[in-house]
Structure formats: structure tokens, C-alpha cells
UniProtKB/Swiss-Prot annotation:
Homodimer. This is Isopentenyl-diphosphate Delta-isomerase. The active site is at 67, 116. Mg(2+) binds at residues 67, 87.
Amino acid sequence: MQTEHVILLNAQGVPTGTLEKYAAHTADTRLHLAFSSWLFNAKGQLLVTRRALSKKAWPGVWTNSVCGHPQLGESNEDAVIRRCRYELGVEITPPESIYPDFRYRATDPSGIVENEVCPVFAARTTSALQINDDEVMDYQWCDLADVLHGIDATPWAFSPWMVMQATNREARKRLSAFTQLK
């Protein structure tokens, strides 16, 4: 895969430039654009993934299905599709926005900061997973209710962005709609 960049943003969320992704994530990470996606299978189960130990930020942490950064000129939806193919080896339904104005800042135990405007999406797949070990070290298909209960009971066991997304009432409601079989 070619070198990825992040789209830098000012405080109002307006693009101001780009920076190589690996260089962008430091102890003083500048605000940038990202996305987060929750993927459901034909049984209405959520894919929860564990980040590879080689990841710069939050290695080995359990999180929602896929996260990433849209590239210059790429829509958020196309970025979700691209990363689902790259990380999970799956085709997905068109991503649906579930939390369009999500923004967060969090620091991992090593001091690496995430500072993102991060629209959240959900999608479905019927494809068999073909996991990219450079991105994902483990995964589990779970009932959403069980995951939400786990987040409520032990938020420290999940990525901070997953916890913040899952505790938003409207996002939780929209995620629940994806558990209904179609």
C-alpha cells in the first residue's frame, strides 16, 4: 500500500494541508481528519477487532471494526470501503453515517495522541474475512448488546474512541438498527 497521509484541519475543521500518517501521530498530534466504522455481518453481529501490536497508537487494544484516514480527494465513504478491503479483505454495503460530528482527543499509555475529527459509519458485509495481520491481531463477531454492556462495565478494555462513540445515545440507537436482519 502506498504511503498514507492525514488531512490536517484548523480548529473550525477546515483543511490546511497534509502530513505523512506515521509522522502525524506524536505526543503533540495536530488536529486531522479520520473516520471510524462499525461492521455487521448477515447475522447482525458486530465485528470487534484487536489492533496489531505493530500499530503506533493503542497497539493490542480492542476496538470497533475499522478506522483510518481519508486521503486527499477521497470521500469518507470511499475511505471506509478502502480500509475494509485492506484491513479485513471484505466488500461492504455503502457505509451509513451514524455519528457525523464525532471529534475527540486521547493519549495512549506511550504518550501518542489521537486528535481527530472522526465521522463514524456503519456498514454490513457478507464476505468471509481475510485479515491483514499488519493491522489486526485478533477479531470476534459479537452481539452488539454484549459489546455495549462490556463497554459500560469495563471501558478501559476498549479504545477510547470506541467507548466515546458507543456512549453517544444517538449513535447507539443507529448502531442498534444494524443488528436487524435484512
